[in-house]
């Protein structure tokens, strides 16, 4: 079949279709479909199907779905902020100009110039916002190993000259100390040079062993910082350092608080014999409460007479 015959058959079919609808449209009108020859309802459906919401400005404005606000127009390339625009303010670090530039201090010049993050001289040096506990505690790594990986930037104390505590505030060292006189860490390592043993008022004790008030402590601070076996020095009552210490001058009042301190937590469940306290103190070696011997920390006591059970007393009376 020739192409001309196919064209003539199609043309005849188009005339039949136009006669059925009552119109006299040509074949060009059948193939060239435009918006004028299509009903408005069909046009809206075709437009909604062929329109994409992700395309650019070529597709025109599309109404939003029912119940949604209209979309804001996308800014053009001239309205978008550029990341390299001069109006962008650079964020400064909290440590900006808080340390001296090492290169400038050694050679007197710096390759970064005014853009350097470190201070070029004392005039540009700023005061850093430190933590309230900055340089108020000992560095454990420097104390145990003799060195610290952080060096001068460590927030803990390495040397006595680094103590930056305010003069109006008491210096608090949170260094746990055992009753044998050595820190609770490694007992073989000596303290750093320049530090004598921490005093009792500046040490934090464990909750199970509450220290007596400062006015009632009869022992010197060196009693807890001495090695085991060293005789304990007794504080002279005449050399009192505060009014609360001058009120206790007799030996009975001096050694009175030790009577309550020498008892272990299980003393109330035992008898009143001093030997019972000594035996209970030796059995509770792992407890935190200190148990002192009467011959070392107090005046010698007379041995108590042997006690007998009440039933034996009744038997001896009846006989």
Swiss-Prot record:
Q: Where is this region: Necessary for nuclear export?
A: 1-15
Asked whether the UniProt record includes S-adenosyl-L-methionine among its keywords, one would answer no
Region: Disordered; residue ranges are 65-95, 179-309
Which parts of this chain are annotated as the region Necessary for mRNA decay activation? 166-319
Pfam families noted in UniProt: zf-CCCH
On modification after translation, the UniProt record reads: Phosphorylated. Phosphorylation at serine and/or threonine residues occurs in a p38 MAPK- and MAPKAPK2-dependent manner. Phosphorylated by MAPKAPK2 at Ser-52 and Ser-178; phosphorylation increases its stability and cytoplasmic localization, promotes binding to 14-3-3 adapter proteins and inhibits the recruitment of cytoplasmic CCR4-NOT and PAN2-PAN3 deadenylase complexes to the mRNA decay machinery, thereby inhibiting ZFP36-induced ARE-containing mRNA deadenylation and decay processes. Phosphorylation by MAPKAPK2 does not impair ARE-containing RNA-binding. Ubiquitinated; pyruvate kinase (PKM)-dependent ubiquitination leads to proteasomal degradation through a p38 MAPK signaling pathway.
Q: What is this protein called?
A: mRNA decay activator protein ZFP36
Q: Which organism is it from?
A: Mus musculus (Mouse)
Q: What is the lineage of its organism?
A: Eukaryota, Metazoa, Chordata, Craniata, Vertebrata
The gene behind this protein is Zfp36
């Amino acid at each position: 079949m020739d192409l001309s015959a196919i064209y003539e058959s199609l043309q005849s079919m188009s005339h039949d279709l136009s006669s059925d609808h009552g119109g006299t449209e040509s074949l060009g009108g059948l193939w060239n479909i435009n918006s004028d020859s299509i009903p408005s309802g069909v046009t809206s459906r075709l437009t909604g199907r062929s329109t994409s919401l992700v395309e650019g400005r070529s597709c025109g404005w599309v109404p939003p779905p029912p119940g949604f606000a209209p979309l804001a127009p996308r800014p053009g390339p001239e309205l978008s902020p550029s990341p390299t625009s001069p109006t962008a303010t650079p964020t400064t670090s909290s440590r900006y100009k808080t340390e001296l530039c090492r290169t400038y201090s050694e050679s007197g010049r710096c390759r970064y110039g005014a853009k350097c993050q470190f201070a070029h001289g004392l005039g540009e040096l700023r005061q850093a916002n430190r933590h309230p506990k900055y340089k108020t505690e000992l560095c454990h790594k420097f104390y145990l190993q003799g060195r610290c990986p952080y060096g001068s930037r460590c927030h803990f104390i390495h040397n006595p000259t680094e103590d930056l505590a305010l003069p109006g505030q008491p210096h608090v060292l949170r260094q746990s100390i055992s009753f044998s006189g050595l820190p609770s860490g490694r007992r073989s390592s000596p303290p750093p040079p320049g530090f004598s043993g921490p005093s009792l008022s500046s040490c934090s004790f464990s909750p199970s062993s509450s220290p007596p008030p400062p006015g009632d402590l009869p022992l010197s601070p060196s009693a807890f910082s001495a090695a085991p076996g060293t005789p304990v020095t007794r504080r002279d009552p005449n050399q009192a350092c505060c009014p609360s210490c001058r009120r206790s001058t007799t030996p009975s009042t001096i050694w009175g608080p030790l009577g309550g301190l020498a008892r272990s937590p299980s003393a109330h469940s035992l008898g009143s014999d001093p030997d019972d306290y000594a035996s209970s103190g030796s059995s509770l070696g792992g407890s935190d409460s200190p148990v002192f011997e009467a011959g070392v920390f107090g005046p010698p006591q007379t041995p108590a007479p042997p006690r007998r059970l009440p039933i034996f007393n009744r038997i001896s009376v009846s006989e």
